[in-house]
């Protein structure tokens, strides 16, 4: 439904180019999350490595069927913690800095259709599922991760529990034998659930997507204090016991809109109490529209989310299904996330996962290409994820070429890393290697082209911070070629990263912010020449190249214009732009205040041209605001745009 807004905008005359001292500018707190520079390895403990066969005897163990426990556990994932081992030390060797594990809590009893090997059917949230190990095993896992300087991210569920509640003519009940099936005790109280039937056809008052049972699982009333405070107590203890650095929150779009506003501050306080000052929470909100997705961050106050729009766009580009302009269009939405507390660089990016399927399978299904293109296109997708904005996450097994059989999604995307007993997985095709047969995937890791490439990409990020989620500017996006400039503020050096999804080499002239010193190739085999700030490069087919300038950025001139603001009817926010022209990679910070003597409030910082932020009318309803924007170039010079005034009517 469209809403009418009244907008009154007054701007001053165009300000001449000038460096200014801006002592009155308020300090802007960093919006970067604690994982902002990390590389995440996402893994199913049950499918990684069996380190303790004594826990294979519990009900639900059936390594020949895809829907049951297969024997992997915390001991297997931990390993010996020594170099050359296949546990955490192997993950560290691949270049990852954080490990995200599926939920470890005790699962409901297995059914004839499967067991909770994936961790999303929890009933006892205070203990480790015995199939995966014990609390002592979890302590050892955490200690090994700390020794290897690996951060731990735990997948958690707050929307629902395992399926214990039944219905009789729309009346919910718990059978006597399951009356105390859940832990802690408040989870056994029917009053803490919505009890309105399936999400697809619920009978309650409210949106079924939030109050209905997710695939038959018991939907909690996450709007109730007993629930959000109870979950805060539960998951705070996991942080305190094991020193976790982050949570991935499953089904985050299905909880109450205000849940994270109540829950997250308690989680962050618990983390700080044990010395973790920048705990990261990212939610699973399966929506490929960035306009929808950003509202979960800006209005619902999820710290950050998994970037489903990036997944779709990156895979389509890597497959050759779409061209570079589509990637450019995606990044144009990044300003929607910008605020004083959020930024698109905090989004957790990925190419495939345990639900939709693996990246190679998705690339294969997007467009008919020659069989020998699948490997380079898979590498291209990973390079785009590693070197553009966001926090990359790689799904376990992708590094050894796992693809998937049939549709390749859900159960069929959760293969064993150890020697499998599932028949279809023994003969399943792989990208970059042969079917695994009776062997295991650890033996082929060091020689696998994807694993080797990921190590190279990780090494480049580690040696060159500009490549690791730093400032980014799109320099060229046409047909099959996308070229980005990257910059780390501390270094002041410009990098060019070019991605070619075409089967032919592409030549282009790229205008940069560096006019002297030439360029050094860090990745790939490009043909490069430079004249002043224009770099002429030829990027080989289906490849990524990285160039580093030999001298610091020197094209730092800035021309400032005016601030404009008008309603963006697609998002419902006020798009507020700063007219700034420069070849440099700048920082533009926007501010507002509602009275002449009031404090300046940060609206966020944009580091990618064109420079803009989006003002949420719900935050400033019926207020007259004075707007201000400052610009900082690579040499540290500051500029200020003329102030503007805006009045926002009630939504």
Task: Name these PLM-found stretches.
Residues 39-44, 97-103, 124, 151-155, ...:
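Structural recognition of the beta-strand scaffold that forms the well-ordered cores
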Residues 48-57, 357-360, 425-427:
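Short, solvent-exposed loop/turn elements at domain surfaces
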Residues 142, 160, 233-343, 347, ...:
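Active-site-proximal helices and loops of the catalytic beta/alpha 8
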Residues 5-6, 12, 16-42, 57-63, ...:
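Carbohydrate-interacting/catalytic domains
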Residues 563-651:
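Long, low-complexity serine/threonine/glycine- and acidic-rich segments characteristic of extracellular
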Residues 82-91, 442, 510, 610-620:
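Signal that preferentially marks extracellular ectodomain short beta-strand elements
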Residues 26-27, 31-39, 46-242, 262-274, ...:
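Substrate-binding/active-site clefts of carbohydrate-active enzymes
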Residues 344-371:
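Active-site clefts of carbohydrate-active enzymes
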């Amino acid at each position: 439904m469209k809403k009418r807004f009244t907008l009154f905008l007054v701007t001053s005359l165009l300000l001449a180019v000038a460096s200014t001292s801006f002592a009155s500018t308020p300090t802007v707190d960093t919006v970067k999350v604690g994982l902002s520079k990390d590389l995440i390895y996402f893994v199913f403990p049950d499918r990684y490595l069996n380190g303790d066969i004594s826990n294979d005897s519990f009900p639900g163990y059936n390594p020949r069927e895809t829907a049951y426990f297969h024997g992997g556990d915390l001991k297997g994932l931990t390993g010996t913690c020594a170099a050359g081992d296949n546990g955490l030390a192997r993950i560290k060797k691949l270049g990852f800095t954080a490990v995200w594990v599926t939920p470890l809590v005790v699962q409901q009893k297995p059914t004839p259709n499967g067991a909770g090997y994936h961790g999303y059917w929890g009933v006892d949230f205070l203990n480790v599922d015995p199939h995966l190990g014990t609390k002592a095993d979890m302590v050892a896992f955490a200690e090994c991760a700390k020794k290897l300087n690996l951060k731990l991210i735990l997948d958690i569920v707050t929307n629902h529990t395992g399926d214990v509640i039944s219905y009789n003519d729309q009346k919910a009940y718990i059978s006597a034998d399951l009356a105390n099936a859940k832990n802690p005790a408040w989870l056994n109280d029917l009053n803490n659930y919505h009890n309105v039937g399936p999400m697809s056809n619920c009978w309650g008052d409210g949106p079924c997507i939030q109050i209905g049972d997710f695939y038959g699982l018991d939907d909690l009333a996450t709007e109730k204090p007993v629930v959000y405070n109870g979950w805060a107590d539960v998951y705070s203890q996991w942080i305190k016991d094991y020193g976790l650095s982050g949570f991935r929150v499953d089904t985050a779009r299905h909880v109450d809109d205000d849940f994270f506003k109540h829950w997250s501050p308690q989680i962050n306080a618990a983390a700080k109490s044990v010395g973790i000052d920048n705990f990261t929470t990212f939610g699973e909100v399966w929506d490929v529209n960035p306009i929808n997705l950003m509202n979960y961050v800006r209005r619902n106050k999820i710290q950050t989310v998994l970037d489903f729009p990036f997944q779709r766009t990156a895979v389509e580009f890597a497959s050759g299904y779409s061209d570079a302009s589509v990637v450019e269009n995606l990044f144009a939405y990044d300003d929607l996330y910008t605020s004083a507390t959020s930024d698109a660089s905090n989004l957790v990016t990925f190419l495939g996962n345990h639900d939709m399927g693996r990246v190679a399978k998705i690339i294969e299904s997007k467009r008919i290409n020659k069989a020998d293109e699948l490997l380079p296109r898979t590498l291209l997708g990973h390079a785009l994820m590693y070197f553009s904005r966001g926090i990359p996450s790689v799904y376990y097994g992708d590094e050894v070429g796992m693809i998937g059989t049939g549709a390749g999604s859900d159960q069929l995307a959760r293969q064993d890393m150890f020697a499998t007993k599932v028949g279809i997985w023994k003969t399943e095709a792989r990208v970059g290697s042969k079917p695994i047969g009776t062997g295991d995937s650890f033996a082929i890791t060091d020689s696998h082209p994807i694993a080797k490439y990921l190590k190279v990409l990780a090494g480049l990020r580690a040696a060159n911070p500009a490549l690791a989620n730093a400032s980014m500017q799109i320099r060229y996006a046409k047909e099959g070629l996308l070229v980005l400039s990257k910059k780390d503020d501390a270094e002041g050096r410009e990098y060019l990263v070019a991605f070619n999804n075409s089967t032919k080499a592409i030549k282009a002239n790229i205008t940069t912010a560096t006019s002297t010193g030439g360029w050094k190739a860090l990745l790939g085999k490009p043909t490069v020449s430079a004249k002043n700030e224009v770099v002429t490069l030829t990027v080989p087919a289906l490849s990524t190249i990285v160039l580093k300038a030999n001298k610091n950025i020197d094209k730092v001139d800035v021309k400032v214009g005016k601030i404009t603001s008008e309603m963006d009817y697609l998002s419902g926010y006020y798009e507020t732009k700063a007219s700034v022209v420069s070849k440099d990679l700048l920082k533009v910070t926007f501010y507002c205040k509602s009275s002449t003597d009031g404090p300046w409030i940060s609206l966020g910082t944009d580091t990618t041209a064109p420079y803009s932020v989006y003002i949420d009318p719900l935050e400033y309803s019926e207020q007259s605001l004075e707007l201000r924007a400052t610009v900082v170039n690579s040499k540290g010079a500051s500029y200020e745009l003329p102030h503007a005034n805006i009045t926002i009517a009630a939504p």
